[in-house]
Amino acid sequence: MTEYDKFAEQLRHPDNPIVFLEVTAGGAPIGTIVIELFADVTPRTAENFRQFCTGEYKKDGVPNGYKNCTFHRVIKDFMIQGGDFCNGDGTGLMSIYGSKFRDENFELKHIGPGMLSMANAGSDTNGCQFFITCAKTDFLDNKHVVFGRVLDGMLTVRKIENVPTGANNKPKLPIVVVQCGQL
């Protein structure tokens, strides 16, 4: 049985890709987050994230993506945010479609912990940054595109959520995606 097969029966749609983020805190391994991407509902957004997980997207021949990227913003009982492999501080913006891309749709909602959603700076400003919810966050519905959910690894999400933070909700320990890809 492959890693993919372990999660296949949990999928919302049988063709949805499954990706993973292997994470460390302060250099120590804390776990892996396994995510279903909702390509059946948000194909463009899911593909953007998938390519940044696999390293398929290249700029000037160099792979760009989430490997060695940090979770730069953590708010307990709300969300963990990462994906800024451009600047590492929440100011970077890049997508496989150019600098940013439009909101695909708001069909899926922030119904509880473990929802994967695009971080943005307003309407139609999606790029590489994402967040995973730690609670129901329905006030974000119709503002942020939900495009996946955690299948396995909520304990890892909770570990990240509970890391002490400083100014701007920045974790005091570096929370790093040391490996990522597609199952």
Curated annotation (Swiss-Prot):
Isomerase found in the keyword field: yes
Cysteine pairings via disulfide bonds: none
Known catalytic reactions: [protein]-peptidylproline (omega=180) = [protein]-peptidylproline (omega=0)
Leading EC class: isomerase
Transmembrane portions of the chain: none
Molecular function per GO: cyclosporin A binding; peptidyl-prolyl cis-trans isomerase activity
Tree of life domain: Eukaryota
Domain PPIase cyclophilin-type: 20-182
EC number: 5.2.1.8
GO cellular component: cytoplasm; intracellular membrane-bounded organelle
InterPro entries to which the protein is assigned, alphabetical: Cyclophilin-like_dom_sf, Cyclophilin-type_PPIase, Cyclophilin-type_PPIase_CS, Cyclophilin-type_PPIase_dom
Keyword terms, alphabetized: Isomerase, Rotamase
Pfam families noted in UniProt: Pro_isomerase
Isomerase keyword on record: yes
PROSITE patterns in UniProt: CSA_PPIASE_1, CSA_PPIASE_2
A single GO BP: protein folding
Job description of the protein: PPIases accelerate the folding of proteins. It catalyzes the cis-trans isomerization of proline imidic peptide bonds in oligopeptides.
Family: Belongs to the cyclophilin-type PPIase family. PPIase H subfamily.
The name this protein goes by in its record: Peptidyl-prolyl cis-trans isomerase 11
Species name: Caenorhabditis elegans
The gene coding this protein: cyn-11
